[in-house]
């Protein structure tokens, strides 16, 4: 059993790094698979984080993740920027296979794989990705200087994308299916006050135009069905996220929206020794601070599980011969 670790954490972000910090401080020597592309989670694509406690003037998303990562590493967490391609979580010893085919074994697993950007599901959406269609304003905004840009969505992310893009763009049109926004009042006020931002209410993108690059959109009125053309060279999609749970289907229980189920208020899944935290579980709050909180809870749940497991193993050991 010498090659069996105490705990493996699949995923990063606030939940994964907090779980890594707590399990590392408990001397559990966690192995963390951060993800080859998604290391750090969604906050790596966020500009100012103004609502994470402890930072009076805010902090850049990547800086916050770098700080969390370094803190976990300081206490002994082993962090690997690699993907997990398969898992077997059903036995007492869990197996996790990385992209190189190496199999890692652990007594407990914490899942913090987060969520991914949701697509509109339209023809040309994927073909024009990187050619005018994007899901990340902080990544691609600079390339749209003095251009007409469209942002789709009505939540905080859409407002943040729009206000960030207004620094570069000639104009930003926010396309939203309804006649009011879901975003927080602070984010709404910021968008409404920006002279470069306008709104296309009760509208959805019906068609994406362009061969080699985006040239425009067809918008459809969600109430009347009428369509109109809108010239744009940039389309930023911010319509929500889907949980990254494909890896766990058939083993861990999922809800109707594909999120992992846990025995709330704990982070226990349906499989003994497997815990889940962050946006892979939460489709209600979806905040960095709540993800970090559940990452802490998952680490404590895993620590207590391992302690109970060690106690039971000691009890099961035969008494020495007299």
Curated annotation (Swiss-Prot):
Q: Name one Pfam family in it.
A: Pyr_redox_2
In this chain, FAD is annotated as bound at: 12-15, 34-42, 51, 84, 279, 286-289
This protein's species is Streptomyces clavuligerus
Q: Which cofactor does it need?
A: FAD
Q: What is this protein called?
A: Thioredoxin reductase
> Where, in this chain's numbering, is NADP(+) bound?
176, 182, 259, 286
NCBIfam families with a match to the protein in the record = TRX_reduct (TIGR01292)
Under catalytic activity, the entry for this protein gives: [thioredoxin]-dithiol + NADP(+) = [thioredoxin]-disulfide + NADPH + H(+)
Which gene codes for it? trxB
In terms of PROSITE patterns, this protein maps to:
PYRIDINE_REDOX_2
């Amino acid at each position: 059993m010498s090659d069996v670790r105490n705990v493996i954490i699949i995923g990063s972000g606030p939940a994964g790094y907090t779980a890594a910090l707590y399990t590392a401080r408990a001397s559990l020597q966690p192995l963390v698979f951060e993800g080859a592309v998604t290391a750090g989670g969604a906050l790596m694509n966020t500009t100012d984080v103004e609502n994470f406690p402890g930072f009076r003037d805010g902090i850049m998303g990547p800086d916050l993740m770098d700080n969390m990562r370094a803190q976990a590493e300081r206490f002994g967490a082993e962090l690997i920027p690699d993907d997990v391609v398969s898992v077997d979580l059903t036995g007492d010893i869990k197996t996790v296979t990385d992209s190189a085919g190496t199999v890692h074994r652990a007594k407990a697993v914490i899942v913090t794989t987060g969520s991914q950007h949701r697509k509109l599901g339209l023809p040309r959406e994927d073909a024009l990705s990187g050619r005018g269609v994007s899901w990340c304003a902080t990544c691609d905004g600079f390339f749209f200087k003095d251009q007409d840009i469209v942002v789709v969505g009505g939540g905080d992310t859409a407002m943040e994308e729009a206000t960030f893009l207004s620094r570069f763009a000639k104009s930003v049109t926010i396309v939203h299916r309804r006649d009011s926004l879901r975003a927080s009042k602070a984010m709404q006020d910021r968008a409404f006050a920006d002279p470069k931002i306008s709104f296309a209410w009760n509208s959805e993108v019906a068609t994406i135009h362009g061969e080699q690059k985006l040239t425009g959109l067809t918008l459809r009125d969600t109430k009347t069905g009428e369509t109109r053309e809108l010239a744009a060279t940039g389309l930023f999609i911010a319509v929500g996220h889907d949980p990254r749970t494909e890896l766990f289907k058939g083993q861990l229980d999922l809800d109707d929206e594909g999120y992992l189920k846990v025995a709330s208020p704990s982070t226990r899944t349906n499989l003994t020794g497997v815990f889940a935290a962050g946006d892979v579980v939460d489709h209600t709050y979806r905040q960095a601070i709540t993800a970090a909180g559940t990452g802490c809870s998952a680490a404590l749940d895993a620590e207590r599980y391992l302690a109970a497991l060690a106690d039971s193993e000691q009890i099961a050991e035969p008494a020495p011969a007299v």
